[in-house]
Amino acid sequence: MKLDLLYEFQPKIKPWTKPHPYGQREAEQRTYDEAIAEIQYADKLGFNTVWCVEHHFRDGRSASSCSEAILGGLALSTSQIKLGFGVTLMPFGFIHPARVAEKVATVDVLSHGRVEWGTGRSTPMEQAAFGVPLDDRSRDHWREAIEIVVGMWENETFAWESENLSFPERMQTPKPFQDPHPPVWQAAATVKSAVSAGELGLGLLSFALLQPVEKMAEHIQAYRSAQAMARPQDMLTRVRNNRVGVYTLVHAYDDGDEAAAYGLWESVNWWYKHLAEFTLRWELPMLSEAEQQAVFPLLQPVLDGQVPVSHYQEQDMIIIGTADECLEKIIRYDEVGVDQLLCYVQFGDLPHDKVMRSLELLAQHVIPKLEARGHRVEATASI
């Protein structure tokens, strides 16, 4: 298993110290400055990939709405760490596929081939704001957009004609550095999406939020089974990516009492409660009745404070502890088939210096032991 990082660029917790808009500006600037410093340090420490999300309108949760700009800056200020789009929102209402081909390839050129390209459809709250269909048409758009992007990369000139989109023959530039193109991933929150990723030859990006490791393992098994049955003619790309990446909150500390004193557990609790609050307010009203019935029982108890932080810890939904304790939990993820653990390290009100120390501990005491265990998947394969 390899250790990655995932950044949503979450501003420090409200209330901010100054009135609007100055408090928001200050909080977001600080978030960016600290995150970039952490990523540059992780590059030196030997972390594998940093993934930057694309989110829109995520009040207090994410200030990362333009991941290509962040990754372009990181391409010029890091030297080893891979740069992950985590993920590009692909339905046509968000962006034209030609723009996706351009921005992903540009970061790949700037970084000399360090891009990992994650793709997804987003959530109803974001889709509605951009005029994206809230039904399965967004899935069709997502798939079609990937075909278009890869076609642009692979051909000197390219044209497209379909019910959803048409454009005349044009040359897309620049082409990506990697040959034939960067590996492609699919964000998957359900078993159905995990199966889709396996069938299409895409890497799987998932999470361990509000579900025990055993439940996550079911998604991975469904992905692996679909992958084993996949036919070359069904692949969306020329790079077969059979890796699994999973994200969760990760923090390593020297001393548990000290960590409690600097607010570690309050930050975990806030992060989960804010997730529940945001989802129930902005996402739930836009879901189908069946989806609401599935989501509401999970989130309302979290919002009401009925789920103690110890529950997440005991179920290994989060990876927090000394370096040795973190390693023990990480090995559980390794054993169920996770190839890359996306460590979500900037959350709540964690002090920047403690995040930096956590990165040090993981690099010194966890990464070498994971390397010694070996890797199921060393690279993607061209087809």
Where are these regions (language model features)?
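Acidic (Asp/Glu)-rich catalytic clusters
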Residues: 43-44, 72-80, 104, 108-114, ...
